[in-house]
């Protein structure tokens, strides 16, 4: 097993990007417009352009007087990042973008097109401080938090690409890219509010179509429940026992399995939403029949019908000694979890060959 890395909850103190329109809530937008000496109605106009028409360049905002476009661009729409590399697979249905921020920081997002939906997997941090040994992102360490605008710009870029490509619409947003979302709590919550707010205050994506993942920061899970955002909570559990989870998911040394599941139950009770349990199945590590039985027993006892297990065949990462469990073992694991009365399916893995699947994002390049 790889030498453990330290847990990092607080991002290194690095300068954040300049203020961007997407960092601002409704009152902040009004204040920013007033600072520029513009009429109050311009704030709503700019929001309609950004969130409704997906335009982030004021020089293209035709309902804005030409004389003020450059001033608005300089004050509210600085360049945050650009695409450093783009790669596709699945016949063009999966597309990974490596973004490079103005300070050189890199992070990734993945756009996945399905017959019935379009999903973008976005990053909340550049890197990750949770140090999970089977995850390429966790092994790379934490560089810095992303700003609210950097998070939202990933969503806007994906939405604009779908629209421009074939008139498609973004339907789902999952915070399953780089980083631990609940370790960048305030910015992630602000981003979720604007993702789900109706136009002109946000992108208008249903809260039920937004998923926030976590390795199990129990107090933050409870805090998120009290926000009443009603997004889907995805808990990366990966094993039901503390002995193994202390190593597989090092944050377990801070909050044990039972405490994390208790927080998940609180989330389900407050929101009425089913909690998703993410479980990367690793050959001869966490795929034993007794672990399937214990997982089903614990989840059924804590969450009853308000839980679903997503089994994820382990995706390969450079230098890893681990690989996915054989299909017969996977099928038996599913059967045993279901036998305990818990819904369980194997996730459709996209992007494995371009290192765009779960646990593979490393922002290299």
Curated annotation (Swiss-Prot):
The record's annotation in Pfam families points to:
Radical_SAM
Cofactor names:
[4Fe-4S] cluster
Protein name stated in the entry: Probable dual-specificity RNA methyltransferase RlmN
Note from the entry: Reaction proceeds by a ping-pong mechanism involving intermediate methylation of a conserved cysteine residue.
Q: Where is the active site?
A: 108, 358
Provide the GO biological process annotations. rRNA base methylation; tRNA methylation
Q: What is its main location?
A: cytoplasm
Q: Which cysteines are joined by disulfide bonds?
A: 121-358
Instruction: Establish whether keyword Cell division is in the entry.
Output: no
Q: Which Gene3D superfamilies match?
A: 1.10.150.530, Aldolase class I
**Domain named Radical SAM core: residues:** 114-352
Q: Which family does it belong to?
A: Belongs to the radical SAM superfamily. RlmN family.
Q: Could you say which residues bind S-adenosyl-L-methionine here?
A: 179-180, 213, 236-238, 315
**Compartments reported by the entry:** Cytoplasm
EC number(s) in its UniProt entry? Answer: 2.1.1.192
- Annotated [4Fe-4S] cluster binding lies at 128, 132, 135
Q: Which reaction does it catalyse?
A: adenosine(2503) in 23S rRNA + 2 reduced [2Fe-2S]-[ferredoxin] + 2 S-adenosyl-L-methionine = 2-methyladenosine(2503) in 23S rRNA + 5'-deoxyadenosine + L-methionine + 2 oxidized [2Fe-2S]-[ferredoxin] + S-adenosyl-L-homocysteine; adenosine(37) in tRNA + 2 reduced [2Fe-2S]-[ferredoxin] + 2 S-adenosyl-L-methionine = 2-methyladenosine(37) in tRNA + 5'-deoxyadenosine + L-methionine + 2 oxidized [2Fe-2S]-[ferredoxin] + S-adenosyl-L-homocysteine
Species this protein is from:
Mycolicibacterium vanbaalenii (strain DSM 7251 / JCM 13017 / BCRC 16820 / KCTC 9966 / NRRL B-24157 / PYR-1)
Q: Output the InterPro entries linked to this UniProt entry.
A: Aldolase_TIM, Elp3/MiaA/NifB-like_rSAM, Methyltransferase_A, RNA_MTrfase_RlmN, rRNA_lsu_MTrfase_RlmN/Cfr, rSAM
| Note on how the cofactor is bound | Binds 1 [4Fe-4S] cluster. The cluster is coordinated with 3 cysteines and an exchangeable S-adenosyl-L-methionine.
């Amino acid at each position: 097993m790889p030498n453990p890395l330290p847990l990092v909850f607080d991002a290194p103190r690095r300068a954040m990007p300049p203020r961007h329109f997407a960092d601002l809530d409704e009152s902040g937008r009004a204040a920013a417009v007033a600072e520029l000496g513009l009429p109050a109605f311009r704030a709503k106009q700019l929001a309609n352009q950004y969130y409704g028409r997906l335009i982030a360049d004021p020089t293209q905002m035709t309902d804005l007087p030409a004389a003020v476009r450059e001033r608005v661009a300089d004050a509210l729409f600085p360049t945050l990042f650009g695409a450093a590399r783009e790669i596709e697979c699945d016949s063009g249905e999966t597309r990974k973008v490596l973004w490079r921020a103005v300070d050189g920081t890199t992070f990734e997002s993945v756009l996945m097109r399905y017959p019935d939906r379009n999903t973008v997997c976005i990053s909340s941090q550049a890197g990750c401080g949770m140090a999970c040994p089977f995850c390429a992102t966790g092994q790379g360490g934490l560089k810095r938090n992303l700003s609210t605008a950097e998070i939202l710009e990933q969503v806007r870029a994906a939405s604009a690409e779908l629209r421009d490509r074939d008139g498609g619409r973004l339907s789902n947003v999952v915070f399953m890219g780089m980083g631990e979302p609940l370790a960048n709590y305030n910015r992630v919550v602000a981003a979720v509010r604007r993702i789900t707010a109706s136009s002109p205050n946000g992108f208008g994506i249903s809260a039920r179509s937004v998923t926030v993942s976590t390795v199990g920061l129990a107090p933050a899970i409870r805090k998120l429940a009290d926000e009443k955002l009603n997004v889907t909570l995805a808990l990366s559990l990966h094993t039901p026992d503390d002995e193994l989870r202390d190593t597989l998911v090092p944050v377990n040394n801070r909050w044990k399995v039972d405490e994390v599941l208790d927080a998940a139950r609180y989330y389900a009770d407050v929101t009425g939403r089913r909690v998703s349990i993410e479980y990367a199945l690793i050959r001869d590590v966490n795929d034993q029949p007794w672990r399937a039985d214990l997982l089903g027993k614990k989840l059924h006892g804590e969450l009853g019908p308000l839980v679903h297990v997503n089994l994820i065949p382990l995706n390969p990462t450079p230098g890893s000694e681990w690989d996915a469990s054989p299909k017969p073992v996977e099928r038996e694991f599913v059967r045993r979890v279901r036998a305990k009365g818990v819904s369980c399916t194997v996730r459709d893995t996209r992007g494995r060959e371009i290192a765009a699947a779960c646990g593979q994002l490393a922002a290299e390049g």
